[in-house]
Amino acid sequence: MGRRKLCAASAVGPDSDRVLMAANDWLSERRTEVAADRILDAAEELFTRHDPGSVGMNEIAKAAGCSRATLYRYYENREALRTAYVNRETYRLFDAIKEKISGITDPRERLGAGIATTLRLVRESPALSSWFATTQPPIGAELAEQSDVITALAAAFVNSLGADDPAVVENRGRWLVRVITSLLIFPGRDVADELAMVEEFVVPIVVPVEQRA
């Protein structure tokens, strides 16, 4: 009987405390992620209705239903919040693009379809397309150029077209980002016109003849 009591007591001893602390840490981290996402969701709604460059931290805090102090606890400034938003949407966009072009194996066709799908998905999103409005400063292009996440995912896409030297892959990925942002700011006459330009001027650089063969 005494042994049973001892075992029962040990069940809520140091090991159990560590388990509870780990669980609490996980819950705390999860709550932080949820709160951060809610703030970005509120910012997204504002980006949909207003020029992203005019949206400040005061407006975002009000839309998110939190104080400025709380907002700054998650994002130290507007640039950090913008970067977090762009990175989140880039991951989502990349996953959607991969799914839509998953059945295309030819590198040339895959590249054209990937660019066309990217342009279409961004343009269909009021929040994302607002970053590339010609009536506003090119904030979207600037963020795309500065984002390590966008650069890395673009390089990963280029790498999926065929193995190559890592430095070459990175350079082609950066070039691809510039091409896409340029088309978002200065679109072609229509989808066919843009695809024709991609096939003539982008494919030969990103997917050389020897690589396609």
Report each predicted region and the residues it spans:
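Amphipathic alpha-helical segments used for helix-helix packing
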Residues: 113, 117-148
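Amphipathic alpha-helical packing segments from all-alpha helical-bundle domains
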Residues: 91-94, 137-174
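Basic, helix-initiating cap at the start of DNA-binding domains
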Residues: 2-50, 54-63, 80-83
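Alpha-helical structural segments
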Residues: 34-45, 49, 63, 80-103, ...
